[in-house]
Amino acid sequence: MRTRIIVNGANGKMGILACETLENHEQFEIVAKLSRQDNLGQSILDTKAQIVVDLTRADCVYENSLTIINHGARPVIGTSGLVETQIDELTKLCEIKQIGGIIAPNFSLGAILMMILATKASEYFSEVEIIEGHHQQKLDAPSGTALKTAEMIAAARKKPKNKLPLKELTPGARGGSHHDINIHSLRLPGLLARQEVLFGNIGETLSITHNSIDRRCFMPGIVLACQKVLNLNNLVYGLEHLL
């Protein structure tokens, strides 16, 4: 029997590709393709969906996630914009409901490997900054991938970074800080998704860069998440935990 899936945000560029990918997969059946005006909770009840893949917007992803879990479906969240307190609340709710779920800041397997490699490098380089770039339709900054990368690096590095007595002549020139790691966000035409993690040491730098040049690079990760989520009874933050 095929797994019943709703794609929320089905009319967007990612949503269209996700529908195409999942429809052509023998394990899955798409039972609804939803957009902003549709009633997500009622659709879950009507279709008896087991999984909801959310590819919507940062301004509604938290409420969507609550709706999915409270209606007994398993969330596969590919929308950025969730902050740490919201992720904590969703984690607790999944524990109470004994429902598995996945929040994936990035579905690209290459991006996940970039994050893993950066985490390893942070054991040896304490000085690091992140430069992320996306298309101009991405309204939240920094990206979920950059935030997750900073969290992984902060948890792994063995000594704090140097405290520099700098004065910003233009406010924000040094970027934003997350877990004491500076993040710089670019929003430019011609970009899809790009991230560089730049480490510095005495006499050397190390750059780990990933470029997404076609949204199809995210599809294997969506398939993997949908395959794995039914076997979970907790919320997983980051696709790296499923590899």
Curated annotation (Swiss-Prot):
Q: Which GO terms describe its biological process?
A: diaminopimelate biosynthetic process; lysine biosynthetic process via diaminopimelate
Active site annotation, chain numbering: 134, 138
Cite a GO CC annotation: cytosol
Membrane-spanning residues = none
Q: Which domain of life is it from?
A: Bacteria
The UniProt annotation places NAD(+) binding at 9-14, 78-80, 104-107
- In which pathway does this enzyme or protein participate? Amino-acid biosynthesis; L-lysine biosynthesis via DAP pathway; (S)-tetrahydrodipicolinate from L-aspartate: step 4/4
Indicate where this protein resides in the cell.
Cytoplasm
Enzyme Commission code = 1.17.1.8
**UniProt KW keywords:** Amino-acid biosynthesis, Cytoplasm, Diaminopimelate biosynthesis, Lysine biosynthesis, NAD, NADP, Oxidoreductase
Q: A GO molecular function for this record?
A: oxidoreductase activity, acting on CH or CH2 groups, NAD or NADP as acceptor
Where, in this chain's numbering, is (S)-2,3,4,5-tetrahydrodipicolinate bound? 135, 144-145
One Pfam family here:
DapB_N
Q: What catalytic reaction does the record list?
A: (S)-2,3,4,5-tetrahydrodipicolinate + NAD(+) + H2O = (2S,4S)-4-hydroxy-2,3,4,5-tetrahydrodipicolinate + NADH + H(+); (S)-2,3,4,5-tetrahydrodipicolinate + NADP(+) + H2O = (2S,4S)-4-hydroxy-2,3,4,5-tetrahydrodipicolinate + NADPH + H(+)
Annotated family: Belongs to the DapB family.
Q: Which NCBIfam families match?
A: dapB
Tell me, in a sentence or two, what this protein's role is: Catalyzes the conversion of 4-hydroxy-tetrahydrodipicolinate (HTPA) to tetrahydrodipicolinate.
The protein's name is: 4-hydroxy-tetrahydrodipicolinate reductase
Can you name the source organism?
A: Legionella pneumophila subsp. pneumophila (strain Philadelphia 1 / ATCC 33152 / DSM 7513)
